[in-house]
């Protein structure tokens, strides 16, 4: 149950297709459910996030998915955005709801076309804060390569108007965090490390005195292979 007394933050995962956004979303809910079970957290499995038949069949996120989790200090509503270029409109819908974004970048690939586009679109829709999760670090043994990927990401963030030199970059593996039985494992600790900068994000000013406004969204699967 959500504790309405806690400050609320809207966050979400953005980035290139197959870099691990949905896996990270599942890992966040799972690790927090283990570490802070008394905070109303519930583990959400990967296939519960990408639950539409076409998403399961193709192994990609098409529509935005929503989960919730909490720390001792804050409540988070999390939007998992699609990374495929064909569903960029759905990504924009999700990003427009965010106070802060978690940019997911694979350590094996570095910045890819949708990495760049998602940073640009996040800036254009008014996402003020970005935290970087460098994923799949378990399969990269070369520290120099990890440093090069981090440098590339920081330069890209700076190019699109974010303070690239100051943004937190957390290196981890969402898959390994999900596989760990103990919530105190090394990869689960990386998930908690990711939460630290999110806990420090300035709380947005909510316009409580203005008329109520909310977004309405849906994805219609009426053509094979195409979402509208």
Curated annotation (Swiss-Prot):
It comes from the Bacteria. Residues 80-83 are annotated as: G3. InterPro entries: EF-Tu_GTP-bd, EF-Tu_GTPase, G_TR_CS, P-loop_NTPase, Small_GTP-bd, T_Tr_GTP-bd_dom. Residues 173-175 are annotated as: G5. It holds the Pfam family GTP_EFTU. Residues 59-63 are annotated as: G2. Residues 6-212 form the tr-type G domain. Belongs to the TRAFAC class translation factor GTPase superfamily. Classic translation factor GTPase family. EF-Tu/EF-1A subfamily. This is Putative elongation factor Tu-like protein. It comes from Ehrlichia ruminantium (strain Welgevonden).
């Amino acid at each position: 149950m959500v504790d309405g007394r806690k400050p609320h933050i809207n966050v979400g995962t953005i980035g290139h297709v197959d870099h691990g956004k949905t896996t990270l979303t599942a890992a966040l809910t799972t690790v927090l459910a283990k570490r802070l079970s008394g905070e109303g957290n519930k583990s959400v499995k990967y296939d519960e996030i990408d639950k539409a038949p076409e998403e399961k069949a193709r192994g990609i996120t098409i529509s935005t998915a929503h989960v919730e989790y909490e720390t001792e200090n804050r409540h988070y509503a999390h939007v998992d955005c699609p990374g495929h270029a064909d569903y960029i409109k759905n990504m924009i819908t999700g990003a427009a709801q965010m106070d802060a974004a978690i940019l997911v970048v694979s350590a094996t690939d570095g910045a890819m076309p949708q990495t760049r586009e998602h940073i640009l679109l996040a800036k254009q829709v008014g996402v003020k804060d970005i935290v970087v999760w460098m994923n799949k670090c378990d399969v990269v043994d070369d520290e120099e390569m990890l440093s090069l990927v981090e440098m590339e990401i920081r330069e890209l963030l700076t190019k699109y108007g974010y303070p690239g030199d100051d943004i937190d970059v957390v290196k981890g593996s969402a898959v390994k965090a999900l596989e760990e039985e103990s919530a105190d494992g090394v990869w689960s600790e990386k998930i908690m490390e990711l939460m630290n900068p999110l806990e420090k994000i300035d709380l947005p000013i909510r316009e409580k005195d203005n008329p109520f406004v909310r977004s309405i969204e849906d994805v219609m699967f009426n053509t094979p292979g195409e979402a509208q």
